[in-house]
Amino acid sequence: MISLDLAVMEELADCYKAVDSGRAFQREQGFVQWTEEYPNLETLRSDITCGKGYAVKVDGAVAGYLCIDFDGEPAYDTIDGAWRTKGPYAVVHRMAFDRVFRGMGLADATFSRIEALCGARGVRNIRVDTDFPNLRMQHVLEKNGFVRCGVIIFQGSEKIAYDKTLP
């Protein structure tokens, strides 16, 4: 069974293992979106402390990690393009899965659960960004109904900005 749960501090090491696995996977794909400095252990610790860190679990085991922020993203205030969505939105950052769990369709399952979480909170819009070389994430986003809206600057580099409006 796949679940999306608020991460707790006792899961920090497993969540970071998923992020570190994602970082290595990016390098295997020939690009660097995440450096050794970001996201780091303190980034995840802060996410979890603030109630924004989520663990993707398979049969209770941490298989992935992501940040879901319902407070918006200041970097999204300026876009070369235009957001299609207005009003409150959730931001998805730092989605990664442990290598052991790859190939199970977890990204699609996770987005389905993110949408359910947003619906339960009355939030109908989701925004995400990714690097230009991250073709896999672009494919996952587009397959899950996200639409390219333009380019934003996040942490000093250009990212492709996507959004999705929920029914």
Where on the chain are the PLM-derived regions?
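Conserved beta-hairpin
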Residues: K52-D69
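A short beta-loop-alpha structural element at the N-terminal edge
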Residues: S3-K17
